[in-house]
């Protein structure tokens, strides 16, 4: 078959004479094999391109996580330093070349005390911790205030001329062991104070008149559990509602806001999100009738039906809510165990193993969040005193513990923190920081070089 054209395609491989194009019959088998070859080549190139994109992405993700680990290490370092500074009033931690000045001592005391009234400036009706429990918030270990107060009374009688915590732990009162509160009990009962991120695990919102966990969307349910189980709540000065299981000597009203001020506090009974009972009982905050009215008004604003809700107002009996009267008759608490997740305190309500609220452990382990500001959920860094002093002494010439003032190069650039700064921290902090960003799930010696520097 010939097709005649008015154009001249002399240079065309299909031309057949001047001005003519000859289209010969096509061999379909040859075309098919040629197409298969092209398709295979396309598949190979696509696969190679995908692998390259994955490598670039994984490399970027690893670099970002390594950079994040430096941020985590810096925050862990300052948490360890903060604890050491708070603990300095109890045990001489730093090897100062000269005695601590009065100004330095007052700065440390004001730092501790400032945590007690946090939030008072936001709302006029906010309530701070009862005076008896200030000592709990100031104590770096947050030992149960009721127990500490017994030793505080003995310290007042002794007139030893020593600061209370120094007298209690290393001074004249170190051998004092009260029958009503033995040393073992004082050491064991330490109140857990939540950080900003930990606090989110206990936050609840009101949706269509029912109390719902903010993160999981599950209804609050306190009806199941062993007899005597108590669920407590606080409402912050920002009108955020927090609730969880009370654990004597471990988790109390002061735990939610780390000793900060509240608008309301008490105890609740909730059946699948439906409020049944409100009790304005809190030994830590000792709420008034006004605070209870404020909380009831908050519930009404959020369409909670209070017609069938049993309300117990604050009274003198609230002082015994935290088991002050019957603390001597109760059984000794179980030894403290390390908690794997911040949500665990809310799920250990049932001796039969029936948790009332779903755990977020698996979700937390499988998700990686790069938001590190505002605290790390208080992951306490176990840094030996020797390692801390070694780093402090190495930085004395710069007279600063700020990382940006220690290194020859800047702490961060326009694209973020410098990965090389990780080598400036103790090994324990580096390992914990890598675990936090899911780069090192378990401690492995292979992650560290023989010199103790990070192999990255």
Swiss-Prot record:
The keyword Cytoplasm applies. Residues 315-358 are annotated as: Disordered. This is IQ domain-containing protein IQM3. The gene is IQM3. Induction: By cadmium and lead. Down-regulated by salt stress. Residues 46-75 form the IQ domain. The keyword Nucleus applies. May be involved in biotic and abiotic stress responses. PROSITE patterns: IQ. GO terms for cellular component: cytoplasm; nucleus. It comes from Arabidopsis thaliana (Mouse-ear cress). Expressed in roots, rosette and cauline leaves, flowers and siliques, and at lower levels in stems. PANTHER family: IQ DOMAIN-CONTAINING PROTEIN IQM3 (PTHR31250:SF10). Keywords: Cytoplasm, Nucleus. It is found in: Cytoplasm; Nucleus.
């Amino acid at each position: 078959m010939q097709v005649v054209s008015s154009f001249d395609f002399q240079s065309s491989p299909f031309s057949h004479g001047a001005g003519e194009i000859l289209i010969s019959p096509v061999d379909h088998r040859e075309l098919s094999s040629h197409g298969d070859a092209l398709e295979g080549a396309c598949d190979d190139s696509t696969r190679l391109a995908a692998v390259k994109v994955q490598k670039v992405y994984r490399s970027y993700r690893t670099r970002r996580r390594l950079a994040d680990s430096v941020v985590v290490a810096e925050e862990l370092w300052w948490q360890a330093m903060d604890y050491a500074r708070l603990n300095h009033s109890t045990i001489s931690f730093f090897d100062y070349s000269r005695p601590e000045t009065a100004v330095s001592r007052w700065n440390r005391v004001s730092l501790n005390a400032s945590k007690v009234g946090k939030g008072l400036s936001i709302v006029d009706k906010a309530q701070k911790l009862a005076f008896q429990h200030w000592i709990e918030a100031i104590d770096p270990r947050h030992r149960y205030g009721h127990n500490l107060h017994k030793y505080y009374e003995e310290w007042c009688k002794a007139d030893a001329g020593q600061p209370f915590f120094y007298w209690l732990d290393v001074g004249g009162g170190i051998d004092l062991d009260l029958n009503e509160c033995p040393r073992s009990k004082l050491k064991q009962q330490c109140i857990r104070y939540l950080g900003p991120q930990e606090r989110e695990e206990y936050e609840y919102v009101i949706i269509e008149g029912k109390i719902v966990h903010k993160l999981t969307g599950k209804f609050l349910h306190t009806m199941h559990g062993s007899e005597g189980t108590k669920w407590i709540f606080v409402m912050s000065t920002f009108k955020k509602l927090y609730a969880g299981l009370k654990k004597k000597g471990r988790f109390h009203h002061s735990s939610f806001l780390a000793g900060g001020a509240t608008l309301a506090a008490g105890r609740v009974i909730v059946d699948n999100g439906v409020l049944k009972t409100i009790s304005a009982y809190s030994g830590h905050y000792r709420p008034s009738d006004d605070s209870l009215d404020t909380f009831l008004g908050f519930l009404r604003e959020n369409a909670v039906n209070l017609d069938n809700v049993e309300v117990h107002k604050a009274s003198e009996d609230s002082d015994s809510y935290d088991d002050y009267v019957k603390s001597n008759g109760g059984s000794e608490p179980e030894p403290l165990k390390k908690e794997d997740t911040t949500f665990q305190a809310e799920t250990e309500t049932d001796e039969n193993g029936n948790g009332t609220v779903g755990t977020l452990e698996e979700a937390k382990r499988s998700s990686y969040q790069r938001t590190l500001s505002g605290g790390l959920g208080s992951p306490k860094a176990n840094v030996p005193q020797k390692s801390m002093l070694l780093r402090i002494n190495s930085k004395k010439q710069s007279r600063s513990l700020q990382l940006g003032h220690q290194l020859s190069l800047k702490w961060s650039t326009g694209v973020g923190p410098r990965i090389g700064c990780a080598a400036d921290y103790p090994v324990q902090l580096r390992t914990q920081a890598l675990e936090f960003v899911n780069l090192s799930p378990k401690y492995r010696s292979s992650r560290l070089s023989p010199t103790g520097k990070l192999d990255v």
